[in-house]
Amino acid sequence: MLHRIPAFIRPRPFSGLPLSCGNREVSVAASVLPAAGSGAVRTENTIQRHFCTSRSICSKKDDQSVPANETSQKAAESQGEGKETLKKNLLDVIKDMKVQLNTANVKTTKPRGRQPPAHLETAVGRLQKALGEPPRKRNEFLSPELVAAASAVADSLPFDKQTTKSELLKQLQQHEEESRAQTDRQKRRVSFTQIISNMKIAKSPSMRVSSRPQHQIQFDEEVDSSLSQEKPADFRRRKCLFKGKRLSIFDVKAFDDEAPEPEAAPSLWEIEFAKQLATVSEQPFGNGFEEMIQWTKEGKLWEFPVNNEAGLDDDGSEFHEHIFLEKHLEDFPKQGPIRLFMELVTCGLSKNPYLSVRQKVEHIEWFRNYFNEKRDILKENNIHLTS
């Protein structure tokens, strides 16, 4: 039910704030804002009625209104007190916390994008490999029988056993390293990658027909005919240097008596110049046979008929000279540890295809000279090399 407002009562201006039914603070704020705008303070008891959605009427008796400046100051003070209380609560919580130190290993996380440089990785890998692998022994490539025979020879001799054993094993190790180096060189020589890299793609020459205009051919023919007509007949005759009278400037008998000088072998520079000249004047292959001939010269194909010993620089030595080396052991004793040691040495040399006969004989000669130097000491201990 709505009450009528008499006409003599002056209506109050609408504050523009949303009002809710039964809210005391809103009604007070509605009454304070117009007064704050004008700067006056109302002290009379007034009854404020507002419309609401419900049937009840909101009313408030204001005994005394408060200025707007005081309300804003109170609100700011209340906010400041709230912040201070929050800070105090946080400080209390932090004080109550206990810090526990952990002695576990700290793992530093590396950024995902960054990677160590390549040279650092290779250096670290080599260091780890060097630390992980045990050091190589000098006699790791030698057979245990050969090492045992060398130690037996050293035990049988009267002088320092360790020095004698080390000298013998050192010579054997040197021989083994030479043979291994030659095997690596041989493998490197027959590598498939080297064959492919040296191969050249042969292109068939394109048949080009030189077409000249007709007037140019006629012009050339005319020029040739005019020159041939002008040349005399004597000029066109062929002259031979070995016909006619001799001038007798040189003595023919002196040159005949001189023996022909032996032809010297071409030097390295001449051979290299001939190779360069051949490559410059080289023409594409006409067929497959020419290509196979060239590959045979370069060592990419076997010679035909097939020769298994092709490319071996062995000074023409026979096969049996590589295998049967017992004839070089005549100066050594017939029995005993020295004989056993030398038999093992010759057995290893006969199975080595990478050493020439001269190198094998030199290897045996080294041991002969070594024992001959110790001949006086061996005689004192009743050990004879030729027994």
Swiss-Prot record:
A Gene Ontology MF term for this entry? structural constituent of ribosome
Q: Transit peptide: is it a keyword of this entry? A: yes
- Family annotation (Pfam families): MRP-S31
Q: Which residues form a coiled coil?
A: none
| Extent of Polar residues compositional bias | 66-76, 207-217
One GO CC annotation, please?
Answer: mitochondrion
What InterPro entries does the record point to?
Answer: MRP-S31
Q: Where is this region: Disordered?
A: 59-83, 203-228
- State where the transit peptide lies: 1-56
Q: Tell where it localizes.
A: Mitochondrion
Q: Which UniProt keywords apply?
A: Mitochondrion, Ribonucleoprotein, Ribosomal protein, Transit peptide
The protein's predominant localisation is mitochondrion
The family annotation for this protein states: Belongs to the mitochondrion-specific ribosomal protein mS31 family.
User: How is the quaternary structure described?
Assistant: Component of the mitochondrial ribosome small subunit (28S) which comprises a 12S rRNA and about 30 distinct proteins.
PANTHER family per UniProt: MITOCHONDRIAL RIBOSOMAL PROTEIN S31, SMALL RIBOSOMAL SUBUNIT PROTEIN MS31
In Swiss-Prot or TrEMBL terms, this protein is called Small ribosomal subunit protein mS31
